């Protein structure tokens, strides 16, 4: 998380190797990603950019683009998790409904949900959501992320966000400020130790919401201890 222009997208774009690191390295399962063929690397990734990308065809071909041999059940499950079925089911042709090049015949939120469904249907090792929830209303955002958390429990999930509510319950939050890491930790830890994060949180959440989030995290830790 961080303000516009702080380097969030630049950082995650290093993972699919849109460009390479100039120092240090990025490893996946202990292997430097520069030693992996680009095609093989990207097969392991489910990447959803800031602006959803759709192709001419139909809804089904767009969702299953990264999993051409997948089943209808996989497609429907991905659409359900991405909260896309609510508008797909209203269309006469359902999953065979045509999509124009660039998705010009669907709304921004619908385009984003289909892009998210495509990533889910791919069953990737690593999900990268680059501010992918910004076009969604708050209720859809919350419902989608809850369903996504259940589905992606065996994968690494990286979420770039400007809305603090999107990353509130992440295992680890990285705060960027002017291209540098300003803090790392949970929501509760960062509220105490990171002025940049605290400023973002207080500008977006009410005192009541902040306290509720802290209580949820505390309860979650107690459950883990007693469990």
Which residues does each PLM region occupy?
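ABC-type nucleotide-binding domain
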Residues: 1-227
């Amino acid at each position: 998380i961080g303000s516009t222009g702080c380097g969030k997208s630049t950082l995650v774009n290093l993972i699919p190797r849109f460009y390479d690191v100039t120092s240090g390295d990025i490893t996946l399962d202990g292997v430097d990603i520069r030693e992996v063929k680009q095609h093989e690397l990207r097969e392991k990734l489910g990447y959803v950019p800031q602006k959803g990308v759709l192709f001419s065809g139909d809804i089904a071909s767009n969702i299953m683009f990264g999993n051409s041999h997948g089943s209808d059940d996989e497609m429907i499950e991905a659409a359900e998790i991405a909260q896309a079925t609510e508008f797909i089911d209203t269309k006469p042709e359902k999953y065979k409904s045509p999509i124009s090049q660039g998705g010009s015949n669907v709304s921004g939120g619908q385009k984003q949900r289909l892009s998210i469904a495509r990533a889910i249907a791919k069953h990737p090792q690593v999900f990268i959501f680059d501010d992918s929830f910004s076009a969604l209303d708050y209720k859809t955002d919350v419902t989608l992320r809850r369903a996504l958390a259940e589905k992606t429990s065996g994968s690494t999930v990286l979420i770039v966000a400007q809305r603090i509510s999107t990353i509130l319950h992440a295992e680890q939050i990285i705060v960027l400020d002017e291209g540098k890491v300003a803090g790392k930790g949970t929501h509760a830890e960062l509220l105490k130790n990171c002025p940049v994060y605290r400023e973002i949180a207080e500008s977006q959440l009410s005192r009541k919401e902040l306290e509720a989030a802290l209580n949820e995290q505390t309860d979650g830790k107690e459950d883990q201890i007693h469990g």
